[in-house]
């Protein structure tokens, strides 16, 4: 019995530690500029670090967020990402940025960021935004209509979306609490996986006719 209790305590402690570490680790140096060259590099947060003495201002700089992204696509939106791949100096700093452009009635379809909370500010247009809470919270929808200057937060891991409900283009900027937040677009992931998920599984899960699922998989096929 004593061994059993000890095992339970060890297991619980391991779980607590794992959850506590489930974010970008804090840096143990002033900065760690990501570099592709393995020579004299130190591997941190999935990137090799440049020798700090060789770091320069360009490692912490990006230009171009003043330019609108192309929204000529099926969802009528475009996300311009500025993360560690664009700014190597973001490595280990736990933050990134995106610009989102929406054509009239365009949307950033339901998706989730597995590694980051997102805070979005609308600078132009009118958006309807929201996120859905987890199963244990009965999948509640939290949604608002945003006007320029309004801010909305999407908690880490929650499925969320933005829709331009105006007749003019909309522009938003968002900060994310990870150097590389990751993105999982729900429709693309479920109906466009490689290889595809068995249509019978999705038909039962979504309570759809299997032929409807097959049609959706054909539309989202990579």
From Swiss-Prot:
Keyword line: Apoplast, Disulfide bond, Glycoprotein, Manganese, Metal-binding, Secreted, Signal
GO molecular function: manganese ion binding
Compartments, record wording: Secreted, Extracellular space, Apoplast
Chief location: secreted
One GO cellular component term noted in the UniProt record for this chain: apoplast
Role noted for this protein: May play a role in plant defense. Probably has no oxalate oxidase activity even if the active site is conserved.
Quaternary structure and interacting proteins, as annotated: Oligomer (believed to be a pentamer but probably hexamer).
PANTHER family documented for this protein: GERMIN-LIKE PROTEIN SUBFAMILY 3 MEMBER 3
Record's protein name: Germin-like protein subfamily 1 member 14
Native organism: Arabidopsis thaliana
